[in-house]
């Protein structure tokens, strides 16, 4: 039995699609934890065991982890949380206890790059995510943290300015190169680990994409794919903070985002060497052709 948390989210929904296709050939049953089962297609609900509720709730994870062999763990965003610890480790503590109570053998979690880099000491959400990984590993469960860089898919939030003004923004230096990954590759990495549980102990699995890119590189590729000029504009951390605050996001979360983006510009994502094992397949150009361009043209 594989339990999937956040099955309607960007990564979890892709993972669920993969497992629905592949799990039967591995003799695996699937269970999902979801707040609103109505967000799952009826055809999906018919093929999985559904536990309704929040996976931060002790009673919910107690039901969901009964008889479970493996768990996919992803914490949801909480833009009004009083602290980053409450978003990550605080949300995970009930599940960590349930892993031990129910003898869950393997857990795969969504985390971040940065462990071992100087920038990770004050990197907001990344620092909190790494602490969550340590909490899960301390239970003795076999654990793999998917160590991810910035998602290509984050650009979908900027479809309107890309389409209407030919511009996208970020806070990083324009020519600083770093890995970027597609969420579909993160889901595929999770599926591989959940279906082949021959691994043990605790560790990280970096998902780095096939190449490092700068914001200027991304602007060039966007221009070529969309057939129209697209440029990058660097946003100051002060303006970034003001924009997040204007959206009504809580102070603790805003502080974390600002610290994380500062750390990324200080090399947070550059501490892992790309190898055939860590290089995920989707190029930024392919992602733009297959995902971003249709969204821009819609």
Regions found by a protein language model. Give the residues of each.
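Aromatic "clamp/platform" in nucleotide-sugar-dependent glycosyltransferases that forms part
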Residues: 87-92
């Amino acid at each position: 039995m594989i339990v999937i948390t956040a099955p309607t989210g960007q990564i979890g929904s892709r993972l669920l699609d993969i497992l629905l296709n592949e799990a039967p050939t591995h003799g695996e049953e699937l269970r999902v934890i979801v707040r609103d089962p109505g967000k799952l297609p009826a055809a999906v609900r018919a093929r999985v065991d559904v536990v309704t509720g929040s996976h931060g709730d002790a009673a919910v994870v107690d039901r969901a982890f009964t008889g479970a062999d493996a768990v996919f763990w992803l914490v949801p965003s909480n833009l009004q949380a009083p602290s980053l610890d409450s978003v990550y480790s605080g949300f995970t503590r009930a599940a960590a206890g349930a892993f031990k109570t129910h003898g869950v053998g393997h857990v795969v979690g969504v985390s971040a790059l940065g462990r071992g880099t100087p920038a990770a000491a004050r990197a907001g959400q990344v620092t909190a995510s790494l602490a969550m990984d340590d909490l899960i590993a301390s239970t003795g469960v076999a654990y793999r943290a998917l160590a991810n860089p910035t998602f290509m898919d984050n650009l979908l939030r900027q479809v309107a300015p890309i389409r209407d003004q030919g511009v996208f923004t970020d806070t990083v230096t324009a020519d600083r190169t770093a890995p970027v990954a597609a969420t579909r590759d993160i889901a595929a990495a999770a599926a591989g680990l959940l279906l082949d549980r021959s691994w043990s102990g605790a560790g990280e699995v970096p998902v780095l994409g096939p190449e490092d890119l700068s914001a200027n590189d991304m602007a060039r590729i966007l221009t070529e794919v969309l057939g129209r000029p697209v440029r990058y504009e660097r946003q100051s951390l002060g303006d970034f903070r003001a924009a997040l605050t204007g959206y009504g996001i809580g102070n603790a979360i805003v502080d974390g985002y600002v610290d994380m983006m500062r750390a990324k510009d200080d090399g947070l994502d550059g501490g892992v060497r790309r190898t055939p094992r860590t290089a995920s397949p989707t190029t930024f150009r392919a992602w733009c052709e297959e995902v971003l361009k249709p969204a821009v043209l819609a």
